[in-house]
């Protein structure tokens, strides 16, 4: 099974993924952003790597290849519904996928980004693109919903494990 944690920047995807790995140490973590950064090194004029079909296809290939006999958790923001469906459909054609849509208030998102232990350029980029994310995940097509305001990553991970039948 693949558990895809999606949602706006600052919602806690990485922290929740880490909490899931704490609860399920045999699971694997996949960060599709790494492939995107690599692609941007060879195609610097691309802008956003999510616009590259090679990245979206690679996301699917990496996720399916890593799934094998263990569960995989993927913390990755994909707000464009067409890209999301392309990736999700590609994975679902091969393996069970449970998309989880994490949300939080704008105030919470901005506070978390400000507190996050990332380089200032990363925080600035996230804040610059946050407005485009706010409201983008209101569509139920993005998967099961969990609000993260006032919840710890461990609590959210526990909720996810119950939702997907892995508690």
Feature map (PLM): residue ranges:
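Conserved substrate/cofactor phosphate-moiety recognition/catalytic segment
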Residues: 17-61
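Glycine-rich phosphate-binding loop used to anchor ATP phosphates in small-molecule kinases
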Residues: 51-102
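Small-molecule kinase domains that catalyze NTP-dependent phosphoryl transfer to phosphate-bearing small molecules
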Residues: 115-159, 167
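ATP-binding Walker
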Residues: 11
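Hydrophobic anchor at the beta1->P-loop junction of P-loop NTPases
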Residues: 5
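P-loop (Walker A) phosphate-binding loop of NTP-binding proteins
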Residues: 8
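Walker A/P-loop
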Residues: 14
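Switch/connector loops and helix/strand junctions flanking conserved nucleotide-binding motifs
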Residues: 106-113
């Amino acid at each position: 099974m693949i558990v895809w944690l999606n949602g706006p920047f600052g919602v806690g995807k990485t922290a929740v993924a880490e909490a899931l790995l704490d609860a399920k140490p045999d699971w694997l973590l996949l960060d599709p952003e790494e492939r995107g950064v690599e692609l941007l090194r060879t195609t610097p004029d691309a802008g956003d790597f999510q616009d590259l079909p090679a990245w979206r296809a690679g996301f699917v290939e990496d996720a399916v290849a890593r799934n094998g006999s263990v569960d995989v958790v993927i913390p990755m923001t994909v707000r464009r519904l067409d890209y999301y469906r392309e990736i999700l459909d590609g994975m679902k054609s091969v393996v069970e996928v449970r998309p989880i849509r994490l949300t939080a208030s704008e105030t919470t998102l901005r506070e978390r980004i400000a507190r996050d232990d990332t380089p200032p350029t990363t925080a600035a980029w996230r804040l610059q693109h946050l407005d485009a994310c706010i409201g983008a995940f209101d569509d139920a097509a993005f998967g099961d919903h969990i609000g993260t305001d006032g919840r710890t990553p461990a609590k959210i991970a526990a909720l996810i494990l119950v939702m997907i039948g892995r508690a």
